[in-house]
């Protein structure tokens, strides 16, 4: 799950978003998004679907996105 938390940060950084902006874009708070980035909790299936749609990425992209992208 380490990859997922880093990749969420990378997706957010590519757009120049704050955690609050990223969270709001997928229907959660910035606090929740931050917990995902830190690996404290993880998005559920519905939230992953929202991330896929908002960021135009697949589940595999979320998991395997190259961390050098940031």
Identify what each model region corresponds to:
Residues 1, 10-16, 24, 31, ...:
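Short, charged recognition helix plus adjacent turn
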């Amino acid at each position: 799950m380490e990859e997922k938390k880093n990749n969420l940060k990378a997706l957010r950084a590519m757009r120049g978003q704050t955690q609050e902006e990223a969270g709001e874009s997928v229907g959660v708070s910035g606090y929740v998004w931050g917990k995902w980035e830190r690996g404290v909790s993880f998005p559920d299936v519905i939230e992953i679907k929202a991330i896929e749609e908002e960021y135009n990425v697949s589940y595999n992209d979320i998991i395997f996105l190259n961390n050098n992208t940031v």
